[in-house]
């Protein structure tokens, strides 16, 4: 507000995006490509972008394409694995690659430093898990997206694929693995910063760091633009009011409290269940250089998706790193740099019963988290030694990962713990929030396209936006899941533009 009590037009934007992580940055990039005249405001409570779940060390998994993450293909009672989710996630990641390739082609991204080749391997070593992996392989290899998947139980192949995993292992232990060579690691923190820089330089995007949204309210007075949101922020310069016809809540775990404050009825169905994580990080750079793949195992019964054990080659701050985990834990914070009061403050009359029902019907998850919380450093290291038999404790240190807030959703059948992500949008499309976790960042482009479809349907149906989308995402009006030729064309284009074919 201005000193005379009137509203400052300069504090009016076409869209306000909350949270400077990969989701808001992706949406900002998409909106700018579709309409370069839009005035966008990004608000971030921390002092820089991508410091929460988008940061490399905080992300539970990077480069998700369902190549090796076994929790995306659960075993069914009929003895076959479900493949629909894996196919959908793979197609979503291909869409992300397609988008990055277009931005690089247009000069919006100036390098591919955020993207690295890393083979994706699934590895197991118990008879039951080997049988599961074999069934998974037999089904996936016939699907075009996974046609290049290889299987082996040969010790020489295994030693070539994952030398650290096989070194020092009992020669009598049965081990099986699948491998897809065309895998990647993505530094989503670096990508977030790469998205934001040209948008800020062009003047299309204003970013306010150290600024928190304290409240948001719908304006419907006659002298206001119908439906504008009044967003109250607190930052270095004090309290400020901004207005916009569209608000996106992409603040990770912080999105749920803001969704509740918005007052839209669509938010009444949701609660959050926070899960924290820990990594063992390798301090030996030479050892990290020997691991050229992401190696995923199989999660324990009842474990949440972010706790699938894996030995992860990951680029952090421009250099190759090696992580193992994540180990699950519990904290009532919704953000790594949040408050212990986040969970209790989110309880409402509409979500209390669903939360209690989820606790009562997910005993295995509760038991798993309790056991994880009770783990000693030696027990965590024993889990690492199961993957790396020759690991030395002095080479590894404990690091805190990011917070994940799993969705609890009210339904006719009661409260349900919902894994994955969900876009919650106001009925008129004026506000959208992203809740949940995994696979998250890797599928950000597809998720933000859903936001556009639900919140900008008329503009998305216009000839202008359709032409722009077709140029930006040549396969947008095709389906790579059902058309192998479309998938092949997408991959050839993306690999060429992004340098993944080398």
From Swiss-Prot:
Gene Ontology molecular function: any one: L-malate dehydrogenase (quinone) activity
Pfam families per UniProt: Mqo
One of the GO BP terms on file: tricarboxylic acid cycle
Superkingdom in the source lineage: Bacteria
Keyword field: FAD, Flavoprotein, Oxidoreductase, Tricarboxylic acid cycle
Biological pathway: Carbohydrate metabolism; tricarboxylic acid cycle; oxaloacetate from (S)-malate (quinone route): step 1/1
NAD in keyword set: no
Swiss-Prot/TrEMBL catalytic activity: (S)-malate + a quinone = a quinol + oxaloacetate
Cofactor needs: FAD
InterPro entries: FAD/NAD-bd_sf (IPR036188), MQO (IPR006231)
NCBIfam families: mal_quin_oxido (TIGR01320), PRK05257.2-1 (NF003606), PRK05257.2-3 (NF003607), PRK05257.3-2 (NF003611)
Family, per entry: Belongs to the MQO family.
HAMAP family for this protein: MQO
Protein name per Swiss-Prot or TrEMBL: Probable malate:quinone oxidoreductase
Originating species: Synechococcus sp. (strain CC9902)
Gene: mqo
């Amino acid at each position: 507000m201005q000193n005379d009590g009137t509203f400052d037009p300069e504090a009016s934007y076409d869209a306000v995006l909350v949270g400077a992580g990969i989701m808001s940055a992706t949406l900002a990039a998409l909106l700018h490509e579709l309409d370069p005249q839009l005035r966008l405001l990004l608000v971030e409570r921390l002092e820089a972008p991508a410091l929460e779940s988008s940061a490399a060390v905080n992300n539970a998994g990077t480069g998700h394409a369902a190549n090796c993450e076994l929790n995306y293909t659960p075993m069914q009672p009929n003895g076959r694995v479900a493949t629909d989710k894996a196919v959908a996630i793979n197609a979503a990641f291909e869409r992300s690659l397609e988008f990055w390739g277009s931005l690089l082609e247009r000069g919006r991204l100036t390098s591919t430093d955020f993207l690295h080749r890393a083979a994706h391997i699934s590895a197991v070593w118990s008879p039951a898990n080997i049988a599961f992996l074999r069934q998974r392989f037999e089904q996936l290899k016939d699907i075009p997206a996974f046609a290049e998947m290889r299987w082996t139980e040969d010790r020489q192949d295994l030693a070539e694929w994952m030398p650290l995993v096989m070194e020092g292992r009992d020669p009598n232990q049965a081990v099986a693995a699948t491998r897809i060579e065309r895998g990647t690691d993505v530094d989503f923190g670096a990508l977030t910063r790469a998205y934001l820089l040209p948008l800020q330089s062009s003047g299309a995007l204003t970013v306010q760091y150290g600024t928190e949204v304290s409240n948001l309210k719908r304006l419907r007075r006659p002298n206001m633009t119908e439906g504008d949101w009044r967003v109250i922020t607190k930052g270095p310069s004090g309290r400020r009011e901004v207005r916009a016809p569209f608000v996106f809540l992409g603040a990770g775990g912080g999105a749920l409290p803001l969704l509740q404050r918005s007052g839209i009825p669509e938010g009444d169905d949701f609660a959050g269940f926070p899960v924290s994580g820990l990594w063992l990080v390798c301090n030996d750079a030479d050892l990290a250089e020997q691991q050229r793949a992401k190696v995923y195992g199989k999660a324990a019964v009842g474990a949440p998706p972010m706790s699938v054990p894996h030995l992860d080659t990951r680029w952090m701050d421009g250099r190759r790193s090696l992580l193992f985990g994540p180990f699950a834990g519990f904290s009532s914070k919704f953000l790594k740099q949040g408050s212990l009061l986040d969970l209790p403050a989110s309880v409402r009359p509409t979500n209390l019963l669903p939360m209690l029902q989820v606790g009562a019907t997910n005993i295995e998850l509760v038991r798993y988290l309790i056991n994880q919380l009770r783990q000693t450093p030696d027990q965590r290291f024993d889990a690492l030694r199961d993957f790396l038999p020759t690991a030395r404790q002095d080479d590894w240190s404990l690091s805190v990962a990011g917070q994940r807030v799993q969705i609890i959703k009210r339904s006719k059948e009661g409260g349900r713990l919902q894994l994955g992500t969900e876009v919650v949008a106001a009925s008129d499309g004026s506000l959208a929030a992203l809740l949940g976790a995994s696979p998250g960042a890797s599928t950000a482009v597809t998720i933000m396209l859903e936001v556009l479809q639900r919140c900008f349907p008329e503009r998305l149906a216009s000839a202008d936006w359709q032409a722009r989308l077709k140029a930006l995402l040549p396969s947008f009006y095709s389906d790579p899941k059902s058309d192998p030729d479309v998938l092949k064309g997408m991959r050839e284009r993306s690999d060429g533009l992004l340098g993944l074919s080398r």
